[in-house]
């Protein structure tokens, strides 16, 4: 890009050509880095000042016919590139804006679905009163059943205690009968011993009787032998007596002896028979007595055995009844414990479902609140984009094409400042229109910032700690942007002051080119430039000071 400077303090004029590349200044955080904007707008004041200055040098403009047309073509191509980039960036912004709108519609649809789900959950949460009544009714019925089972259990326990008392009585009677049986068995043993002794005595007496009978038989035999011997002797004596008449008569002596022995034998036999009869009678009586006692003992033992077996059967029956009652009680306890465990599990499940429902409802409410916050943030972002788009449309209504700065210098060396390169639209327009554009843009920025701050204040009420941190971060980012803007303006001011000191006077602002670029669809690439000088730097300083004051106020906010 070429620029020309004019110095009226020298007698001769000299053309000074300065080549400079277009500068890019990105002020918005949401545009692509390749975007460059500029708005070379020409005001009526600039036109008047340029007419005044160009009237003196109109005679010299005919000498610039030899200007390099390639530079003009380069400027036109640069302007085309810039316009193409602006168009592409606008299309990109439109696409992003459409995507944001689609996202907002999608979030609205999801919001409606979540509201419907929340309404259903609230209805479900309000309905469980009837379900609670049903559960309470079932719990009451189960408690009544439990109380009935408890009463039955108490009755069974009382019956069990009664049977245990009866069992204890029967056990006492059984022990008494066992003692009586032991006594009877002891007496039976005694009787058996006596019977055995009697049997032994009888056997002994029988043996003695046999021995006595043998002795009697032996004595009879001996007596018979003696009698036969005596008879033979008597006969021999008679014979001898007959033979010998003079021999004495011994028959009388023998008869006496025989009579004595017979008396003695009869007496012994009679005494033995009497003793035997008396002993036999005694033994017979004793045996009869023992037999009666044994029979009575046997009868008593059999009766005791019968009673013992009967009592044993009764005890077994009582034990069976007791076991059956214990099993029934155990079954009832197990059944009741199972029912109680089932009811407890059901209650735990219901409580768990209630907790899950509450947690799910809380989660849905949190998601709904998050979606509301996202929606609010998107609404704020959409409002900010709308404000930015409106400001962009307002700026584009004043946009131009480019600027060609021309002029002549004296033949002597000139230390003039080079032409301004293409800068951002906001910066160039603020310099070209210090009275209108700066105030207008600042008002729009303040309105946008006030809208954003009010929306952030509402978000801060909903999301206290986290949103406050985000606000602080965003304010710091905005402060950084403001500092960058102030730094750039400060640098430009320093450059101007340095150039003004080199020239030794207050210079007017250099002219800006206004170019009109036709649409690329028509394929036209013509560019027309008109150079005009701006007002003096003194008219721009109050606007810059006012913008700095507003930025300081914004930082304080």
UniProtKB/Swiss-Prot annotation:
Name of the featured protein: Neurofilament light polypeptide
PANTHER family in alphabetical order: GLIAL FIBRILLARY ACIDIC PROTEIN, NEUROFILAMENT LIGHT POLYPEPTIDE
Species this protein is from: Xenopus tropicalis (Western clawed frog)
The keyword Signal belongs to this UniProt entry's keyword annotation: no
N-acetylserine carried by residues: 2
Cellular component, GO annotation: axon; cytoplasm; intermediate filament
Annotated InterPro entries: IF_conserved (IPR018039), IF_rod_dom (IPR039008), Intermed_filament_DNA-bd (IPR006821), Intermediate_filament (IPR050405)
Region spans: Linker 2: 268-276
Acidic residues bias (residue ranges): 465-538
Main location: other
Region feature Tail, subdomain A, mapped onto this chain: 393-437
Region of interest: Coil 2B: 277-392
């Amino acid at each position: 890009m070429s620029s020309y400077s004019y110095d009226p303090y020298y007698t001769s004029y000299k053309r000074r050509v300065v080549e400079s590349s277009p500068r890019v200044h990105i002020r918005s955080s949401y545009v692509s880095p390749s975007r460059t904007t500029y708005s070379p707008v020409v005001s009526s004041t600039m036109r008047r000042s340029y007419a005044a200055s160009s009237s003196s040098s109109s005679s010299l403009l005919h000498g610039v016919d030899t200007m390099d047309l390639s530079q003009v073509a380069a400027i036109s191509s640069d302007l085309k590139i810039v316009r193409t980039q602006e168009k592409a960036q606008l299309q990109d912004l439109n696409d992003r804006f459409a995507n944001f709108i689609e996202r907002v519609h999608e979030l609205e649809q999801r919001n409606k679905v979540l509201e419907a789900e929340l309404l259903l959950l609230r209805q479900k949460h309000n309905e469980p009163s009837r379900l609670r009544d049903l559960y309470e009714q079932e719990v009451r019925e189960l408690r009544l059943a439990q109380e009935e089972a408890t009463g039955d259990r108490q009755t069974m326990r009382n019956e069990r205690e009664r049977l245990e008392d009866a069992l204890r009585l029967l056990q006492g009677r059984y022990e008494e009968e066992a003692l009586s049986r032991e006594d009877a068995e002891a007496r039976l043993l005694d009787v058996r011993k006596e019977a055995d002794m009697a049997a032994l005595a009888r056997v002994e007496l029988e043996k003695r009787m046999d021995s006595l009978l043998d002795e009697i038989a032996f004595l009879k035999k001996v007596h018979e032998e003696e009698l036969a011997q005596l008879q033979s002797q008597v006969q021999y004596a008679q014979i001898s007596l007959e033979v010998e008449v003079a021999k004495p008569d011994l028959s009388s002596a023998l008869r006496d002896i025989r009579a004595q022995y017979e008396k003695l034998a009869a007496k012994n036999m009679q005494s033995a028979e009497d003793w035997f009869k008396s002993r036999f009678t005694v033994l017979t009586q004793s045996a009869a007595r023992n037999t009666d006692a044994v029979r009575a003992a046997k009868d008593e033992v059999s009766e005791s055995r019968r009673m013992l077996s009967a009592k044993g059967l009764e005890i077994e029956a009582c034990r069976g009844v007791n076991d059956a009652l214990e099993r029934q009680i155990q079954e009832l306890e197990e059944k009741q414990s199972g029912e109680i465990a089932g009811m407890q599990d059901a209650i735990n499940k219901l409580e768990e479902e209630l907790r899950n429902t509450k947690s799910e409802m809380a989660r849905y409410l949190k998601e709904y609140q998050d979606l509301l916050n996202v929606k609010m943030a998107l609404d704020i972002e959409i409002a900010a984009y709308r404000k930015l788009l409106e400001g962009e449309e307002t700026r584009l209504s004043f946009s131009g094409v480019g600027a060609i700065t021309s002029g002549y210098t004296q033949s002597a060396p000139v230390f003039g400042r080079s032409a301004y390169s293409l800068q951002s639209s906001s910066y160039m327009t603020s310099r070209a229109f210090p009275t209108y554009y700066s105030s207008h843009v600042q008002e729009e920025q303040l309105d946008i910032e006030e809208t954003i701050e009010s929306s952030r204040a509402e978000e801060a009420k909903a999301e206290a700690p986290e949103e406050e941190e985000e606000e602080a971060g965003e304010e710091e980012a905005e402060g950084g942007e403001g500092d960058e803007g102030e730094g750039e303006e400060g640098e430009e001011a320093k450059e101007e002051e340095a150039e003004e000191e080199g020239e030794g006077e207050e210079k007017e602002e250099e002219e800006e080119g206004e170019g009109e670029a036709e649409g690329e669809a028509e394929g036209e690439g013509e560019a027309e430039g008109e150079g005009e000088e701006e007002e003096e730097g003194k008219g721009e300083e109050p606007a810059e000071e006012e913008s700095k004051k507003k930025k300081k106020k914004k930082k304080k906010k």
